[in-house]
């Protein structure tokens, strides 16, 4: 009887511990998923603007009041729509075949788009209004023909119209010039 009581007590505690640790997953609504998929398409339009060197296509997905934090350090100053447009044109003048490869460079995943999360405050969130994007930009330096590639990470906040309202991105901007310089050095005759 004592053995049976011990087994019962162990099973009872195991059940209590399991039920306390067994949390249900967060359910993403169909509306949130549709919004997330639309935002992925918005970002793909942005990257197609780079590939096609079409500044109007690139800017068509940006809110008029967009605030951009560029990948290069600039004293943490936000850049407006005009500055973003000028930067896009500068890339068009310097590079050809600008292509974004979503998820490229991630370890253990090829998914380049993420939204919703468990934040440091411990709160879970399924709202897709803020999207993280990971991937690699590949291009050819126009003047030298140097192939250039850069791992990239961006955080995009979308407004109610589905346009990008806040945009922060990170990549090794100086590494692009290093790749060009290395290419030129290795191809000297």
Regions found by a protein language model. Give the residues of each.
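C-terminal motif of bacterial Sec signal peptides marking the signal peptidase cleavage site
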Residues: 15-19
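Bacterial N-terminal signal peptides that target proteins for export
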Residues: 1-8
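Short, linear, compositionally biased motifs with a strong N-terminal bias
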Residues: 11-13
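C-terminal and inter-domain tail/linker signature
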Residues: 5, 21-189
